[in-house]
Amino acid sequence: DSDHWTNIKEIGGGRIVGEAVHGIDLACYFFDSLPQSISASAPVDKTNNMVKDNQVFLNINFANGSHASLQYFSEANQILSKERIEVHGEGNSYILEDFKMLRFLEGSQDRSKTFSSGKGHKESLSIFFDYVRDKSQNPFTWEEIKAVSKAAIIAQDHINSGQQHNV
């Protein structure tokens, strides 16, 4: 849908800045580290030779040596989950589907757990109001917000230039 807010860069910043940025932020949370460099690629629409930035591949290197590979697809089959996160390491794998089902593959065990899920709006507002009322500390630092936002903006720039950029 070309008139959707995420596709109008002047309004929503595009798919990377408007949506894929949340994946960058989540990776920072998982690794407890800020991004140091990012590269991105996207397919080119053969009919108009324009980059399809709603189909994006992001590779991010973090300050602590971790690495994340994020793929954002807005044109996938609707049967698939909208959001899928896979974490692999030390012979174990964890797969999170739509933030509702977590599959644990540890050694020879294959277990899963289901969760109720929302969009996080209620929780975000609660955190914000607790901070405004001096009931809690701000869980976000300016350094984190700046690094995640800068990584998303650089990723969009990278798609257009084809070069890796330091964050």
PLM feature spans:
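Active-site rim elements
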Residues: 13-14, 113-115, 134-138
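C-terminal helix-rich "cap/oligomerization" subdomain common to oxidoreductases
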Residues: 57, 63, 130-167
